[in-house]
Amino acid sequence: MNGRIPALVLICAAVAAGVGVWYAQEYGFYDRLDPAGVTLTVMAQGKPVPLAAREVQAIDADSSPIRWRACFRLTGALPEGAEPFSQPTPLIGPRWFSCFDAGRIDTDLKSGAAQAYLGQPEVRPDVDRVIAVYPD
């Protein structure tokens, strides 16, 4: 009986901490971005070229440079000389940002159903922004 209450307190504290960490990772730090304020680029011949897009949905978090995610439809073709990106690795985003499915994008990149291009190099040291382009 003497150890039950402290054990119960420890278990409840662990569950509360786990819920807090989960919430912070899924919802706490992310912000939806205004589509008008999102600048989409692709590197072509060593220079960033702006991309025109519609249906832009984007999220970001101040806590990490790798939390930026966006889904969009290009309104035109990629510019001549767009730089392909070798070995892209889509990172999993929050579940509620349903337009971005990292697993599907990874599968499509590996199968050739989508192509990866360098969007913006060195957003932060060793962090590149990459876009996956589908043929449609």
Which role fits each region the language model picked out?
Residues R4-G81:
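N-terminal export/targeting and maturation segments
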Residues Q57-V123:
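Mature extracytoplasmic domains of secretory-pathway proteins
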Residues P125-D128, P135-D136:
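C-terminal partner/receptor-binding element of secreted or periplasmic proteins
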Residues P35, A132-Y134:
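Aromatic- and glycine-enriched beta-alpha-beta binding-site module
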